[in-house]
Amino acid sequence: MGRKNIKTITTCLFAALIFAACKKDGNTTGPTPNTSEKRKVFVVCEGSFGNGNSSMSLYLPDKDSVYEDAFKSINAQELGDVFQSMTRIGNSYFLCLNNSDRVLCLNEDLTLNKYLSVPKPRYVLEINESKAYVSSLYNDKVYIINPSTFSVTGRIQLPHMNTEGMALYNGKAYICTWDTSVNKIYSINTSSDQLEDSFTISGFAPQEVLVDKEQKLWVLSGNIAKGKPAAWTRIDPVTGQVLRSFYFPPKADPIHPVLNNTKDTIYFIEVNYDGGNENNGIYRMSIHDASLSAQPFIGAAPYQYYWALGIEPVSGNIYVGDPKGFIQKGSVMVFTPDGTKIKEFAVAVGPGHFYFEQ
């Protein structure tokens, strides 16, 4: 949602080349997936903004089977408008439908249980079996839900708008507010649900926060469209001290960072909307690196950009989503940990995130 205007502008530029390069994959199976498979890769397909065509694609690696619209095939209804993220708490899945103002609650077999009304939901952060936080675009609040009773139980006021990425560490939830005037992240005491502290970061507009193997926070900030260059800040959550700062080139637009399974290497996407190779592809850095890499680990082709990134827990394989301009079905590419491409398959429109289940 936050970058939809940029994606719309670039659609015309990419359209002709995207259609020419589109490859139909032959491994898509019938309409009803086998939800009893233990190893699953859920592909969160945003759809195109305002069209209500988001989808949940499902890949079963052990069967090499792809279901492009698993939710619709099981529930006989559309998912909603802009599928932003999903997570599992207990035996239920929670799906954030950003532009539908809903969090869908699914049973273990992917049947719809109910939905919660939350304005512009972005991400769900599990606190415990009876509490989770939901961030909310265009709002200065984090919403509290009970995953056991499927109810909205409260809200937490933040000082700024656009609550976005969240992380849990040592009884505190660290919250990003993707506001261009903000150079802080905020901590919430998860026992009292009260705003407790804030830490200054090295850039503006914090959007994502991760916790590495040494229990340090990594905050990704920036909003290139609004003139705020991107930066990484590594912070000690005990003292609030800034340990390292990394500043990206002016045109670099990093998004969707993830840690590897040992939490000692960060992977992220850089997006070049102009169709060039500079600052475009999958990048990675060790938590002990002294500088950012100038070259991508997995480069994007000319007039291509990536939008989804995830690392599978069992294999360590790297999953990358190509939205193909959000004007047709997207694709997912799978790479080994050393960057060798081993698989590509078609998914629904706009792959934006992955959720792995083992």
Regions found by a protein language model. Name each.
Residues 43-51, 95-99, 134-138, 175-180, ...:
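Conserved beta-strand positions in repeat-built beta-propeller and related beta-rich domains
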Residues 37-39, 90-92, 129-130, 170-171, ...:
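Short coil/turn segments that connect the beta-strands within blades of beta-propeller domains
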Residues 50-58, 102-105, 141-143, 181-186, ...:
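Structural motif
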Residues 1-41:
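Bacterial Sec-dependent N-terminal signal peptides
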Residues 72-79, 114-119, 155-160, 198-203, ...:
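Surface loop/turn motifs at the tips and blade-to-blade linkers of beta-strand repeat domains
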Residues 80-85, 120-127, 161-168, 204-212, ...:
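Repeated scaffold domains used in trafficking and secretory/extracellular systems
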Residues 25-107, 139, 323, 328-329, ...:
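Acidic/polar, low-complexity intrinsically disordered N-terminal segments immediately downstream
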Residues 61-63, 107-111, 146-150, 189-194, ...:
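Short loop/turn segments that connect beta-strands within beta-propeller blades
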